[in-house]
Structures are given as C-alpha cells and as structure tokens.
A protein has these predicted regions:
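ATPase nucleotide-binding head domains, primarily ABC-like/P-loop NTPase cores
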Residues: 1-208
Length: 208
C-alpha cells in the first residue's frame, strides 16, 4: 500500500468487493500487531479507515441506496479534508445511478482523493475513468474455461482473481458471458444480445 488513489475494475463476480474487505481486514490486523494474510506486505499506519461497502438504503427515513451512499461519501470527504493519514475504500461508487452521471461522480471523487494524497482504493464497473490515478484490473475469466456450467460452488475454477496494471479506460464487458455460463434462459439472453447488437454493431455475441 502506498499513498495515492487506485481504481480497480473487473467483471461482475470477479472479487472486487472481497478485495476491499480483505484490505480493510489486513489494515486492522497490522495496526493491532497481528499477522496479515499475505506472503509479504507493506502497509503504513493510518489514523482512520473509511469504507463505503454495501447498501445503506433506509426505507424508514426515505433514503434511497444512492442518497445513502452519497451521504456516506460526503462524510468521507469531510474526514479527508481534516487529516491525511486515512485509508479510503469505496466499492462500486455511484453504481445505483445512471452511467453518465455515475462515471462523472467516480472521476470527481477520484480526482479529489488523488489531490489530497490519501491512500484510497475505489472499485467501479464504469468505463471512461480519466481522473489521474493508478489503475488495476482483475484478470477475470480464464480464457480456456469459457464453456461449461458455472455455479456458486465451482466459480473459482472459471475466474483468475489476480490483479494486473491497466492503462486503458474500458472495463471488461462480461455480464452476458456470466449469464450464459450460469444457464440463464436462452431465449431471454438472445433477446438481450439482439438489443446489444442494435446499439453497437461491433459487439460480438457470446454464443455464435
């Protein structure tokens, strides 16, 4: 871990959320003097670990998932303005709003975190993240395992969870591949792929 903001992309079910939770756990273990689950680790001490992981929707108080997330991120921003020794972990920022504004929100927050030189990791499924940051990508599906029936019990056989540097702005588009491998209704998936091809003629069908 080092100062600066890292944006992590990857396919659905590729372990991005688990990665953030693992980093959070490792940071706490290290600061309390315990071994961390790694062959080696370099982790500076921080005054606070701030996380936005999960859904804080509150129907009783009229908070949507998006509103709850924005309030939580706003509190993080206030904390970052006050101190620099902070670890910020944000999972799928702005995932519950439309892609255009969601992408802009990710860029704005990442730009803010980079400017304030805090340690931060932000996961996203949005393409077009142009704010200055380090970019990593979960490798995702093992290419020679594109066929077969994937279940929650054997998913680890299909996905490579390791990280690699990623200089591009596009994120993996593997939602349809996951749906096919999970055995979702073929008729519905074919309709979905027809719409995808209408929107993007260069888009290739998952199953030819």
């Amino acid at each position: 871990m080092e100062k600066g903001t890292t944006v992590i992309t990857g396919a659905n079910m590729a372990g991005k959320t688990v990665l953030l939770k693992s980093v959070q756990l490792a940071q706490y273990l290290m600061q309390f003097g315990f071994y961390v689950p790694a062959r080696r680790a370099g982790m500076p001490l921080v005054e606070q670990v701030l996380t936005s992981i999960g859904d804080d929707q509150d129907e009783l108080n009229g908070l949507s998932s998006y509103a709850a997330e924005m309030l939580r991120v706003d509190e993080m921003i206030r904390q970052v303005r006050q101190r620099s020794k902070i670890l910020v972990l944000i999972d799928e920022l702005a995932r519950t709003t439309n892609p255009v504004e969601g992408r802009a929100i990710v860029n704005g927050v990442v730009d803010f975190l980079t400017t304030h030189r805090v340690m931060a990791m932000v996961t996203t499924h949005y393409s077009g993240i142009t704010a200055e940051c380090r970019k990593l990508r979960v490798r995702g599906f093992v290419e020679n395992r594109v066929e077969g029936n994937m279940t929650l019990k054997n998913i680890n056989e299909f996905i490579d969870y390791s990280l690699e540097e990623d200089s591009g702005e596009e994120v993996p588009q593997e939602a349809m591949r996951i749906a096919w491998m999970l055995g979702i209704d073929r008729g519905v998936l074919e309709r979905v792929e027809n719409y995808l091809q209408e929107e993007n003629p260069d888009w290739k069908k998952t199953v030819q």
